[in-house]
Regions:
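N-terminal strand-loop-strand
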Residues: 6-47
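Active-site segment of metal-dependent pyrophosphate-handling enzymes
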Residues: 14-16, 62-65, 69-124, 164-172
């Protein structure tokens, strides 16, 4: 109990969410996880970023790699921590909270997430790795309402990338095929 504010201290859970942005030669896509659940007797299907709560015995970077591997099969992806999201309204939708509590088998109140970002080139090998998972590439303009605040996290990731590329333009070339057109470069 905080004496000045007369409110209880937050009992935060910490999670990691991974924004994996890929370029398939034509457009930018985000790697999302298919999610299904039930709320008030109604079945729902939507999507979310690859993410989960962290374990007590792991570092944030380890958690991000573990979560990405468990949910997508991807290994050794270059992930960069880019922002923390801790709005008290992150868990305002009961559907999200109930889904997470069932998945984690634990009571969840407030969640602070550490967002990670990766830029990858989408190729056959990468897609083959995803075949056995509930993961899918979704073009940026086709992304619908996602779980939690994941739309905001993606928006912030795109802003971060644009600023990052201003100072590190060579990072764009990692996304492009060996031979690329001016149109492909402009798309990025």
């Amino acid at each position: 109990q905080n004496m000045e504010h007369n409110t209880p201290l937050a009992n935060n859970h910490i999670s990691v969410d991974c924004v994996v942005i890929g370029f398939d030669g034509e457009q930018l896509k985000v790697l999302l996880i298919k999610r299904a659940g039930e709320e008030e007797g109604e079945v729902f299907h939507d999507m979310k970023l690859p993410g989960s709560l962290i374990y007590m015995d792991e570092d944030l970077d380890e958690a991000a790699q573990r979560v990405l591997n468990e949910l997508t099969g991807l290994k050794n992806v270059n992930l960069m921590q880019f922002k923390a999201f801790g709005s008290k309204n992150r868990t305002k939708d009961p559907k999200d909270v109930h889904w997470l509590e069932r998945a984690m088998q634990s009571k969840v109140e407030r969640i602070v997430t550490i967002a990670y970002l990766s830029l990858v080139k989408i190729d056959r090998a990468l897609n083959r790795d995803l075949d056995n998972y509930m993961a899918d590439w979704v073009a940026l303009p086709n992304i619908k309402a996602l779980a939690f605040d994941h739309n905001l996290i993606i928006k912030e990731a795109i802003t971060y990338i644009r600023q990052y590329i201003e100072f590190n333009p060579s990072s764009l070339f990692d996304l492009l095929p060996r031979k690329f057109t001016a149109s492909q470069l402009r798309t990025l």
